[in-house]
Amino acid sequence: MAFYRTNLPTRELFSLVSVVIVLLATNINSVQALSFNFTKLTTANSGVTFQGDAQILPSGLIALTKSSPFPPGQYFTTVGRALSSNLVPLWDSATGKAASFVTSFSFVIDTTEGPITDGLIFFIAPPGTVIPQNSTTPFLGVVDSETSINRFVGLEFDLYRNSWDPEGRHIGIDINSIISTKTVTYNLVSGSLTKVIIIYDSPSSTLSAAIIYENGKISTISQVIDLKTVLPNTVQIGLSAATLTGESYSIHSWSFVSDLETTASYVSNI
């Protein structure tokens, strides 16, 4: 699977990704695969594990952080994560092959409650991952600031410039650290819907993302990452957000599909 820069209109681009997801999902006879498509969720059977302050709203959307207005001039740390309850087979130890995957999600950040801080991240981490200690505010609920041992890969949407960050708000690819290996500018518009498509192409070991703004503009970012050297062969995927000042983070949709050729399917193809 390859990823290319595109001039397609937003609707057509998202439709194309939907077709890719369907095609991958229908190829499960020869591979170990996982797929899901979350739109409006219910507490009865969401397929999502919530941690910290994350919850399902009455509208069926996912709120990652507390959204209640804080008293004037008073701010409180809030961090929350939503993870797929199912584990993702990432690579096969017998064949050495890694999975390719496509995930897409859409979200709204509302910054009307106060100054803007912190941000949101899509992350891949070892199974059983929980919110680390010392991981609030700039560490987005994925990094323990008191240790150098953090194991994850992520795509962050950073709203606040810390000492290690580039100038301005940015989108970054993170590998075991909140210091991004590659960044592009993040053009946040409070209250607008942002759509994200992330593709990992196993043959080229390339993680690529397209960020589609409500006005139709698209940003892209990519990085070569051999996930086998970073993560265990089974992982969990999730979305996390943290803030100190009261902006809200809501997830409006989330889909995922992966494929992994295992030992059995590899032998059957010889």
Curated annotation (Swiss-Prot):
<dbReference type="GO" id="GO:0044403">
    <property type="term" value="P:biological process involved in symbiotic interaction"/>
</dbReference>
<feature type="propeptide">
    <location>
        <begin position="34"/>
        <end position="41"/>
    </location>
</feature>
<keyword id="KW-0430">Lectin</keyword>
<feature type="glycosylation site" description="N-linked (GlcNAc...) asparagine">
    <location>
        <position position="134"/>
    </location>
</feature>
<dbReference type="InterPro" id="IPR016363">
    <property type="entry name" value="L-lectin"/>
</dbReference>
<dbReference type="GO" id="GO:0030246">
    <property type="term" value="F:carbohydrate binding"/>
</dbReference>
<comment type="similarity">
    <text>Belongs to the leguminous lectin family.</text>
</comment>
<feature type="signal peptide">
    <location>
        <begin position="1"/>
        <end position="33"/>
    </location>
</feature>
<dbReference type="InterPro" id="IPR013320">
    <property type="entry name" value="ConA-like_dom_sf"/>
</dbReference>
<keyword id="KW-0325">Glycoprotein</keyword>
<dbReference type="InterPro" id="IPR001220">
    <property type="entry name" value="Legume_lectin_dom"/>
</dbReference>
<comment type="function">
    <text>Involved in symbiosome development.</text>
</comment>
<dbReference type="GO" id="GO:0043661">
    <property type="term" value="C:peribacteroid membrane"/>
</dbReference>
<dbReference type="InterPro" id="IPR050258">
    <property type="entry name" value="Leguminous_Lectin"/>
</dbReference>
<dbReference type="GO" id="GO:0043662">
    <property type="term" value="C:peribacteroid fluid"/>
</dbReference>
<keyword id="KW-0732">Signal</keyword>
<keyword id="KW-0472">Membrane</keyword>
<dbReference type="Pfam" id="PF00139">
    <property type="entry name" value="Lectin_legB"/>
</dbReference>
<protein>
    <recommendedName>
        <fullName>Nodule lectin</fullName>
    </recommendedName>
</protein>
